[in-house]
C-alpha cells in the first residue's frame, strides 16, 4: 500500500489486492458472523452511540454526586412517559447549549415550572435561530446561492474568485450582521447576556446552528429555565450538585443531563481493528478528517464514509455523496492519484481553519460552501454543475435537493 500512487493500486473502487473482513456480533445472542467483502461503506454518522463525557479530576466527577447523571443520548432513548417521569418533581441541571440541551430544558420547564427551575450550564453563546427568515428574507438567499458563495474564499479557487471574495468581504460582514440583528431582536439575547462574541458566518461555517424551541427565552424570563455560564469548560461535581469555576456555592440539583455531544471520531476509529487504519482514518488532531470529497481516504482502499462530514442539510448532502459513490462504482470516473487527493484535503483544511470556529473545524463542515462542494461532485460524475435556468436564477436563487433530481 505504501508504494501505491493510485487508490487501491489502480484508482478504481474494486481491487484484487485484498478484501475486508467484517465481523458482526449479535449483542442479544452473542453470536458472531464473519463476512469477506470487496468494499465497505461506513454510514455511521457522528451524533450517536459514543457520548462525549468531559474528563474530571479524581473525586470531582459524577461519583462525588449524590444524584443521578445521564447523557442526553440516554434521555432521548426513553419513551415520552418515561422521560417525563424522570424529570418530574426534580431539580434538573442540563450541561450544554445546543439542540439537545435546549429541547430537554424545555421539557423540564414544562414538567416543573418555576417551582423547580431547570438550570442550563453552558460555555459558549451561539447564534441559534428562532426561524430561517431573518427580517422576512429566507436564509437560503443569503447563504445557499452562487452569489453568497462569491463572498467567501474557497478551496482551490483561482485568482479571480479570490479577488472577488476579498473585494466583497464588506458585504459578507453585512450579511452576518443582518442575520445577527434579527436573532438578537427576536430572542432578546442582549437582555440575557447571550450575544455571541463571534459572527454568524463563523457559526454557519462550523455547522453549529440549532433551532431555538418556541418560547425558550420566555421560559428564561419567567424563571423556569436558568442560564448559567461556566467561564471555561471546567466544572466539577460535589455531593449537592455542580461546582462552576469561580463560584463558591454549588448548583444544587437532583439530576444532571449531559447534553455535551458525541465522540464521532472515536466511533469511526474504533470500527477498525488495525492500529494503522485507526490512526489514518482520523488523521492529525490539528486537521480536518482527511477524506477526499468527504468520502474517501487516500490511504485506506475499498472503503467510503457517508454522513460523517456535516452540512446544514445532512440528508441532502449524504444523498449527493451516495450518488457520487454509485457513479464511482459504475466506472463513470476514476479517482485521482493519492497525492492529488491529499492536496485537495489540505485545501479544504485551510478553508475550515479560516472560517470555522477554532474548536469546531474538525467537524469538516461544508455549511457555507454547499454549491462549491456539489459542483465538484457534479464535475466528477460528468454532470453539468449549473442547474438553474437563466443567468439571474443561476446566480441568485438558492440551490436545494430538487435541483439535483436528474443528472
Show the residue positions of the predicted features.
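A catalytic-pocket lid/entrance helix-loop region that shapes and gates access to the active site
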Residues: 127-159
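Long alpha-helical segments found as membrane-embedded helices
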Residues: 345-353, 365
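Alpha-helix boundary/capping detector
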Residues: 144, 329, 348-351, 403
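Flavin (primarily FAD) cofactor-binding/catalytic cores of flavoenzymes
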Residues: 1-136, 161-339, 356-407
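Post-kinase regulatory C-tail/linker adjacent to protein kinase catalytic domains
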Residues: 138-141, 340-348
Amino acid at each position: 500500500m505504501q508504494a501505491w500512487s493510485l487508490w487501491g493500486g489502480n484508482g478504481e473502487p474494486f481491487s484484487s489486492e485484498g478484501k475486508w473482513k467484517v465481523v458482526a456480533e449479535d449483542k442479544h445472542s452473542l453470536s458472531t458472523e464473519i463476512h469477506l467483502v470487496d468494499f465497505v461503506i461506513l454510514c455511521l454518522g457522528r451524533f450517536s452511540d459514543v457520548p462525549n463525557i468531559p474528563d474530571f479530576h479524581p473525586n470531582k466527577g459524577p461519583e462525588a454526586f449524590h444524584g443521578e447523571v445521564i447523557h442526553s443520548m440516554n434521555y432521548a432513548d426513553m419513551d415520552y412517559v418515561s422521560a417525563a417521569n424522570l424529570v418530574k418533581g426534580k431539580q434538573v441541571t442540563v450541561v450544554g447549549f445546543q439542540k439537545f440541551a435546549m429541547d430537554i430544558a424545555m421539557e423540564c420547564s414544562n414538567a416543573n415550572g418555576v417551582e423547580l427551575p431547570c438550570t442550563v450550564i453552558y460555555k459558549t453563546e451561539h447564534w441559534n435561530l428562532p426561524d430561517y427568515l431573518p427580517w422576512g428574507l429566507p436564509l437560503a438567499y443569503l447563504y445557499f446561492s452562487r452569489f453568497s458563495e462569491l463572498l467567501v474564499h474557497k478551496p482551490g479557487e483561482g485568482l479571480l474568485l479570490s479577488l472577488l471574495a476579498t473585494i466583497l468581504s464588506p458585504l459578507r460582514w453585512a450579511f452576518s450582521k443582518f442575520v445577527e440583528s434579527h436573532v438578537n431582536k427576536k430572542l432578546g439575547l442582549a437582555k440575557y447576556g447571550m450575544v455571541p462574541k463571534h459572527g454568524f458566518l463563523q457559526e454557519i461555517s462550523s455547522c453549529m446552528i440549532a433551532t431555538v424551541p418556541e418560547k425558550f427565552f420566555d421560559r428564561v424570563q419567567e424563571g423556569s429555565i436558568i442560564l448559567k455560564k461556566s467561564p471555561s469548560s471546567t466544572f466539577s461535581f460535589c455531593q449537592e450538585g455542580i461546582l462552576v469555576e469561580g463560584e463558591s456555592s454549588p448548583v444544587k440539583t437532583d439530576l444532571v443531563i449531559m447534553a455535551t455531544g458525541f465522540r464521532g471520531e472515536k466511533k469511526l476509529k474504533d470500527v477498525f481493528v488495525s492500529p494503522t487504519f485507526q490512526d489514518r482514518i482520523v488523521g492529525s488532531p490539528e486537521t480536518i478528517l482527511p477524506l477526499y470529497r468527504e468520502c474517501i481516504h487516500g490511504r485506506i482502499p475499498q472503503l467510503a464514509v457517508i454522513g460523517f462530514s456535516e452540512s446544514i442539510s445532512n440528508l441532502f448532502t449524504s444523498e449527493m455523496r451516495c450518488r457520487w459513490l454509485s457513479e464511482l462504482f459504475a466506472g463513470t470516473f476514476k479517482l485521482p492519484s493519492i497525492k492529488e487527493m491529499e492536496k485537495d484535503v489540505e485545501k479544504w483544511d485551510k478553508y475550515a481553519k479560516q472560517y470555522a470556529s477554532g474548536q469546531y473545524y474538525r467537524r469538516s463542515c461544508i455549511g457555507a460552501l454547499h454549491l462549491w462542494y456539489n459542483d465538484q461532485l457534479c464535475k466528477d460524475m460528468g454532470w453539468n454543475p449549473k442547474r438553474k435556468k437563466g443567468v439571474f436564477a443561476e446566480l441568485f436563487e438558492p440551490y436545494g435537493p430538487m435541483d439535483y433530481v436528474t443528472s
